[in-house]
A protein has these predicted regions:
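Extended amphipathic alpha-helical scaffold segments
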Residues: 203-211, 273-277
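Extended non-globular scaffold/tether segments
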Residues: 190-201
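Conserved catalytic cores of very large enzyme subunits
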Residues: 2-189, 225-228, 232-765
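A conserved hydrophobic secondary-structure block that centers on an alpha-helix together
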Residues: 214-221
């Protein structure tokens, strides 16, 4: 890492995070002037107004220009989506447990007196709340499931970066002008053209700023850099990039612009090493210094950490630590099925090893053809302990997409949005994180409904759980589809849609079914706890008959605080096998019930003509979802977290080592889980030391691939180090750990999430 990159890193995190009202004020100012116009045009005009008037900056020593806010890592508001939680939490932002932000008293006053009164009763949240039935509201209030993305832009998508970079904005504007001429009444085309032209003007503002700064700069080297930024910006406003610097700059400008349009999470990066390779090679051919090109890439990686998301207190518990979702996958397959590793794949990991920040959320695609040197480079990067890169298995994911009707060529081109959500870049609107389903809460409801049922059998209970899962899935689908319609009718994204295949051919926004592939992704959470609980209950009550069902239920209701409660809990924990130890009897319960969940989910259609797709990952939702579930037959206390990750074993229950964990997860139908899965594994640093440690990790990754698991990620850290960081956070400000599908600064996580990471089983190989 160069001195420049070190200073850029330091500067990014040297100030307190603040809330900026600038986007909200500009958006509102435009919106006041467009009453009565079509929603998609109002949205486009508001975004264009932001691009014209928002304050811009180029920070000291930056090689890549473009900042969403002048101050680093500032949160921005989108009251047009949901003004109510913002009003409620204005005074809580600086002191809340997770994701704190400073906000001035003047900004609070402006929000209360100007922004909230305008958006009250005219936001997307008002529409969604007005459509939700009482039954759906009751289920979400008890957290049987959650409906997400009701308060902000949807995101969770990858635009067609090759189209942007290989054609350039000038050509794209010309194409959109033709569409407008052919269909002059089409509001989508009008909105997209308006925003493409506004993007050009916004980029030219940076060119002018760089020229002004250069004229006043006394340092010769920095003056030349600023003039180059100006030249690149003027070129990118009209023409396609020719060099790596130009490509990186246009790539980042578009990321910033899309943030203004929707303020959404997980506007992910796709297969960066594939579409950026021609520009990197062109720069090498032109004689550019490889060391400088690496510094450019490191600059871009640092920039990815400048965007943080302002979430509600509740949402921050589900998505703790700013998982912005700048996810990029490396390697994988070419369109003809060969290994896709290239020189830029290596450079992306090298640059990450230098910066070691939470974003970008890099991943590596493995398969039977994976290049051994690149596998070793991957293992070397994992060993650093930041949880990056995560690993995805082509041997599972490609068939999973084929099973959903995706073409073979498109399936081989898959990438990931957000944490682990599977998507086809530039062709999919997957609504990937629309809902989370609390499987353990459903079991708890069934247990309580059977109190006093002397005729209850294990098979009868299992059938009731299946039926109840099916029932609540119908409600989850109902709520998800209402949210889907809310985004269509209140929050279209015409600029983003112009970079998604088939939207231009159809003349429709992605929210209106314009994309080639239209999914709605929902996550089943708690399968490990569910199977552990049912296995223990079956043994304790129905086979060994040590307690009656009502006696066990009484102990659970008391949270094990009965005269025999601790003995009962010890037996439940220690005498009955747990998922994650390669024991068929309990693993098969997981497999059967998760398959039931998947098959039920995939029955349903969304308003865009696509189907629901199941996944199993938690982000950090295993903590809040566990908080609403009482004590359970796996020995879990009331309110205790669920198993992390999605497919990970419960904390402390994976006693037979990491290979046994792989074997347990391999018994699940990973192919059905086409919205993504998540498996966390924690290693002690000592087990990966030296060349031998790297080879052991590489072999473990090959075993993961051969066993046909879909996803795996790692923490490589000592629990003692994490405990020290809790006590002395000022000494561990740069400590990055894996949470669930993303990495975060350990000291920026709430204590409950920190404790969760500390408690995860640390394995040895």
């Amino acid at each position: 890492m160069t001195n420049r990159i070190s200073r850029l890193k330091t500067a990014l995190f040297s100030n307190t995070r603040e809330i900026s009202l600038e986007r909200a004020l500009l958006y509102t100012a435009s919106h006041r002037q467009t009453e009565g116009e079509p929603v998609i045009l109002r949205r486009a005009k508001a975004t264009a107004y932001i691009l014209e008037h928002v304050e811009i900056s180029i920070r000291d020593e930056e090689l890549i220009a473009g900042n969403r806010t002048v101050k680093p890592r500032a949160g921005i508001m989108s009251p047009e989506m949901d003004p109510y939680w913002l009003l409620k939490e204005l005074d809580q932002f600086p002191t809340r447990p997770q994701d704190r932000f400073a906000i001035s008293e003047e900004d609070k006053r402006i929000y209360r007196e100007e922004l909230f009164p305008y958006w009250e009763k005219r936001s997307m949240k008002d529409f969604i709340n007005g459509q939700m039935t009482d039954e759906v509201k009751a289920a979400t209030s008890t957290q049987i499931f959650s409906i997400n993305q009701t308060d902000k832009g949807q995101g969770h998508i990858i635009i067609d970066y090759p189209r942007l970079l290989n054609h350039g904005l000038g050509e794209l504007v010309a194409q959109m002008q033709q569409h407008c001429q052919q269909q002059p009444e089409n509001h989508f085309y009008q909105a997209a053209l308006l925003l493409l032209e506004a993007s050009q003007k916004h980029i030219l503002r940076y060119a002018e700023l760089a020229e002004t700064m250069a004229a006043n700069c006394t340092d010769a080297q920095r003056r030349e850099e600023l003039l180059t930024i100006a030249e690149i910006s003027r070129h990118n406003a009209e023409h396609k990039p020719q060099t790596f610097w130009q490509a990186c700059q246009l790539f980042w400008y578009m990321n910033i612009i899309l943030q203004y349009e929707s303020n959404a999470s997980s506007l992910s990066l796709g297969r960066f090493d594939q579409y950026m390779l021609p520009f990197y090679q062109a720069s090498l051919t032109q004689g550019e210094d490889p060391a400088f090109l690496k510094e450019l890439l490191e600059s871009l990686w640092v920039k990815c950490n400048d965007i943080v998301l302002l979430r509600s207190t509740s949402s921050a518990r589900y998505f703790a630590g700013f998982p912005t979702g700048y996810t990029a996958l490396l390697d994988g397959l070419t369109e003809n099925g060969r290994s896709a590793v290239n020189v830029l794949s290596f450079l992306c990991l090298d640059a990450y090893q230098s910066v070691q920040l939470p974003q970008p959320n890099l991943g590596v695609r493995t398969n039977a053809l994976i290049d051994t040197p690149f596998l070793m480079k991957t293992a070397e990067t994992i060993r650093l302990g930041t949880g990056i890169p995560q690993i995805f298995n082509d041997e599972v994911v490609v068939p999973a997409f084929l099973n959903r009707g995706v073409s073979l060529e498109d399936a081989r081109d898959y990438s990931v949005v957000g944490c682990v959500e599977l998507s086809i870049p530039g062709r999919t609107y997957g609504l990937h994180d629309i809902a989370m389903f609390n499987l353990l809460k459903v079991m708890e409801i069934c247990l309580h409904e059977n109190e006093g049922n002397a005729a209850l059998t294990y098979e009868g209970l299992l059938e009731q759980i299946r039926a109840k899962i099916s029932h609540y899935i119908t409600l989850m689908v109902e709520g998800s589809n209402i949210c889907d319609i809310g985004h269509r009718d209140w929050a279209p994204v015409p600029l983003l849609s112009s970079f998604i295949s088939d939207c231009l051919e159809k003349g429709r926004d992605i929210t209106d079914g314009g994309a080639r592939y239209n999914f709605s992704g929902v996550q089943g959470i708690g399968i490990a706890n569910l199977s552990d609980s049912l296995h223990a209950l079956k043994g304790m009550v129905f086979e060994q008959q040590r307690l009656s069902f009502d006696e066990l239920l009484s102990v659970l209701k008391a949270n094990f605080a009965t005269p025999e409660g601790e003995k009962v809990r010890a037996r439940l924990i220690n005498r009955f096998e747990k998922y994650g130890n390669d024991i068929d009897e309990v693993d098969n319960i997981s497999a059967e019930l998760l398959r039931h969940y998947c098959k039920e989910v995939e029955k349903y259609q969304n308003p865009r003509g696509g189907y629901f797709t199941p996944g199993s990952y938690t982000v950090s939702a295993h903590v809040p979802l566990g908080s609403v579930v009482g004590a359970t037959p796996d020995g879990r206390f009331a309110g205790e977290q669920l198993a992390d990750g999605g497919l990970s074993p419960m904390l402390g229950q994976d006693a037979q080592g990491p290979t046994a964990v792989l074997k347990s997860v391999s018994k699940l139908d990973n192919t059905l889980l086409s919205n993504g899965t998540l498996l966390n594994v924690k290693f002690t640093p000592a087990t990966l030391e030296g060349e031998a440690g790297l080879r052991k990790l590489a072999d473990f990754l090959r075993a993961f691939t051969q066993l046909k698991l879909q996803h795996i990620q790692f923490n490589v850290v000592n629990a003692d180090t994490l405990r020290e960081a809790q006590q002395r956070p000022q000494d561990y400000a740069g400590l990055v750990v894996r949470v669930a599908g993303y990495s975060a600064f350990f000291v920026e996580l709430s204590k409950e999430i920190q404790d969760d990471i500390i408690r995860r089983t640390a394995h040895q190989l």
